[in-house]
Curated annotation (Swiss-Prot):
Main location: endoplasmic reticulum
Family per record: Belongs to the EMP24/GP25L family.
Alphabetical GO biological process terms: endoplasmic reticulum to Golgi vesicle-mediated transport; Golgi organization; intracellular protein transport; vesicle-mediated transport
Gene: ERP5
Lumenal membrane side: 21-178
Stretches that traverse the bilayer: 179-199
Protein name: Protein ERP5
Length: 212
């Protein structure tokens, strides 16, 4: 296979995370590659987009596709990745050994004479660092969950206290209403008794007056 080498692309450091972006132009079936030294455990995550030139403008076309390969040049060009994407997609690769790796990109389109533009954005970091970051994020998340749980427990206790106060107030209100009702009935009975006594007294008084 004939390779056209893209020089001067620095996409990563051996341990720290880095981001690199590049684009190149090619015809259908034309392969372009670059080389990069990777350390064991380096994780590559790439965002890939392919555009087709139409009337002077580069546009996405679902009929186009992009093949990505990764070879270990230090191990007799052992191929460790061979992936075919549509006109847009991503790629993920973890270096199994330390050494020079060759990254190759081959765009395909039905019209062979069309000019294709490949846009590549790669993010490369160390798996252990990413795992550590995940653990930190997980611990932070657990801490926040714990705080929310404590807050929820506190809110529930406040709600229970409010319910108890409401129940106590309701009982006091019912007791007061009961006493008021009892006292009102008692007063009404006294009033009725008084009225009955006065009516009887007046009746007897008028009877005596009539007799006299």
């Amino acid at each position: 296979m004939k390779y056209n080498i893209v020089h001067g692309i620095c996409l990563l450091f051996a341990i720290t995370q880095a981001v690199g972006a590049v684009h190149f132009y090619a015809k259908s079936g034309e392969t372009k590659c670059f080389y990069e030294h990777l350390s064991r455990g380096n994780l590559l995550i790439g965002d890939l987009d392919l555009y087709v030139e139409k009337d002077g403008l580069f546009e996405e076309d679902p009929e186009s596709s992009l093949t990505i390969t990764v070879d270990e040049t230090f191990d007799n060009d052992h191929r460790v990745l061979n992936q075919k994407n549509s006109h847009t997609g991503d790629v993920t690769f973890t270096a199994l050994d330390t050494g020079e790796h060759r990254f190759c990109f081959t765009p395909f389109y039905s019209k062979k004479s069309a000019t294709l533009r490949v846009f590549i954005e790669l993010e490369i970091g160390n798996v252990e660092a990413l795992d550590s970051k995940k653990k930190e994020d997980m611990n932070s998340l657990k801490g926040r969950v714990g705080q929310l749980t404590q807050r929820l427990s506190s809110i529930r206790k406040e709600q229970d206290a409010i319910r108890e106060k409401e129940a106590e107030f309701r009982n006091q209100s019912e007791s007061a209403n009961s006493k008021i009702m009892t006292w009102s009935v008692f007063q009404l009975l006294i009033l009725l008794g008084t009225c009955a006594f006065q009516l009887r007294y007046l009746k007897n008084f008028f009877v005596k007056q009539k007799v006299v």
